[in-house]
Amino acid sequence: MKTIILATLIAMPAIATEIKEVRLLTLDPGHFHASLVQKKMYPQVNPVVHVYAPGGPELDQHLKRIEIFNTRPDNPTHWQEKVYTGPDFFEKMIAERAGNVVVISGNNAKKAKYILACIQAGLNVLADKPMAITPADFRLLEKAFIEARNRGLFLYDIMTERYEITTILQRALSRHATVFGRMEDGSPDNPAITKESVHYYCKEVAGKPLTRPPWFYDVKQQGEGIVDVTTHLVDLIQWECFPDQAFHPREVTMLEARRWATPITVAEFKKPTGFDHFPDYLKPSVDKNNVLQVYCNGAFIYTIRGVHAKISVEWKHEAQPGTGDTHYSMMRGTKAALVIRQGKDQNFKPILYVEKRTRLSDAEFERALRIAIGKITQDWPGIDTKKCASGWEVVVPDQYKVGHEAHFSQVTEKYLEYLATGKMTEWEVPNMLTKYSTIMRAYKLSR
């Protein structure tokens, strides 16, 4: 039965009633990503936003961020937040129906239930990742997609990394066979695709130190590392390596998966949370030395349509001054490897490199690369290359380096486009299902 349902979702494009004016509902905004959706105004979106939450510091921080956007000197927003707080906040939102799109970014333990209930109530949903953190959540998510299809609604997760310029260019160059060749199949010991990221609990958002809720350290509420940031990395593998293609979960084979913990002391816990002790719900994860063991790290190797891919996510307490979250991405073709590095040599900014793997001379290869870059500049004027020790560095003008926070607006604009036309790109829904199916297989294999 499940195979039939998935096949139907893949075969039928997502179609909904066109929405010309979007009225946002913000549900229990426990994560700062909820505010980043509102970092700019959108012509299609009503400036009045109804917020439903239980109240408390997480809501206060969300409203403070919106106020910062509203009062900044350059291009301020003009959102009007209408807030309801109380234990019945979710029921109140459903009863009032003050909007037609729900933004969900908060405690992940509740997210899949919220998503399904919102869809069943006839509301479109724009959800932060991950939409599911356990196999039970994934079953709810499958139901939500089926309900959305039946009701003519759009459910979409916020995949910001598709809008990072180095990722866009890596994808674009891989489509030029004269430079990249064809994608290699790789092996478990030498995958053809590698996506790795390192994140930090302590960092700045919108120029201010980020406050984390204590539950962010609870994998039962935030999710383990193997099901969280991995959503971005699996999504990019599908989006970059197989552009505009729909997947079915049966095209994925999970080979190996593991998880491991990051130790967090009370002092480290206090810095982003303000708490000088571990809450009771974290006590089962505290060792005999009073150190919290957070299973926020995960890695797995799998095949997708026969191509071997490796995913790895790590979380650490705090980055060194001047550094931050980092990303490494490698796609290996028969003629070249396309590699994004973001380490010390790159001043912790992502840079794309083209590394020759063919017997062509450097001069011959560079001619082919120049032709490919010339075609890419039709969409991205100013892109260039320069020779470097490992091959060629792709030079990106500053105008395209908009930063991670701006990507939330870009995702929102894409979602608004889907709502305005009443049509979603036909591969989006099946690929979201395949993505979460892949991650859940890794989760189960890592136990």
Model feature map: region roles:
Residues 122, 128-130:
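Short helix/strand-capping hinge loops at secondary-structure junctions
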Residues 7-16:
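Hydrophobic h-region of N-terminal signal peptides that target proteins for export
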